[in-house]
Amino acid sequence: MTTTDRIAAAFARVSEAGRAAALIPYIAAGDPSPQATVPLMHALVRAGADLVELGVPFSDPMADGPVVQRAAERAIAQGVGLRRVLELVADFRRDDSVTPVVLMGYANPIERMGQRAFAQAAQAAGVDGVLVVDYPPEEVDEFAVMLAEAGVAPIFLLAPTSTEARIEAIGRVARGYVYYVSLKGVTGAGSLDTDDVARKLALIRRHVHIPVGVGFGIRDAASAQRIAAHADAVVIGSKLIETMEQAGAQAGADQKNEAAIAAAQQWLHTIRLALDDVKRENAPA
């Protein structure tokens, strides 16, 4: 199965199972350690993840809140950069050729590697999609083509402030899915207005004809269920990372990785069980 096929197949499986929305956890590659990342990814899949978003650690993550920033700092302190992240994806692919992996990060590491070299390396590692937070769609046509030619989906963010013209522009170039940021500000901040999200998704779907995932502000089963009634995917990161962080802090030095992985799997499974009970509000009768 090729990389972009995996994303489409994942959403198709969700639909065929009669589920309202896919579950997409976000973790920072290299946190709590590089050695724990691949086992953690497999644990998330066992817990019910349909896709996995893997954050590429960066020293100046402007869109990330304090929880995700701390995770990136821990990873960077252990020497994890873009090349190591690609190695981790390749390691994951040895045992899982089905679950899509999407890299989420910033332009600087990609620019240092070179856009074309990165696109080719991402495809070789088994990356399915790439979301670059600080690449506006109107400036990355060439890069999006490079990714698409390599079979890697260029994925874009939309926000509450996105104009209809911007939504239309992203609808033309995005592949895989679009990530709607449900709150203004950084990850893990603010409170969720589900009605506002539903209204914005209705506008987005006029111009975007691929799945739309929603993230930011989803911190528990109840908020995940509310979003799943409207979105094609629920993206959840800060609370998951915080859960791992707390479990690792309470464990002995030689048990931090195992404790973090176990806590992540247990917590994410509760979210998956909650999502399995949701019916899409705008689904046909």
Swiss-Prot record:
InterPro entries attached to this UniProt entry: Aldolase_TIM, RibuloseP-bd_barrel, Trp_synthase_alpha_AS, Trp_synthase_suA
Pathway(s): Amino-acid biosynthesis; L-tryptophan biosynthesis; L-tryptophan from chorismate: step 5/5
Top-rank lineage group of the source organism: Bacteria
Cross-referenced Pfam families: Trp_syntA
This protein's UniProt keywords: Amino-acid biosynthesis, Aromatic amino acid biosynthesis, Lyase, Tryptophan biosynthesis
Active site: 53 (proton acceptor), 64 (proton acceptor)
Record-level GO cellular component terms: cytosol
NCBIfam families from the UniProt entry: trpA
Description of how the protein assembles with itself and partners: Tetramer of two alpha and two beta chains.
Annotated protein name in UniProt: Tryptophan synthase alpha chain
Species this chain originates from: Bordetella pertussis (strain Tohama I / ATCC BAA-589 / NCTC 13251)
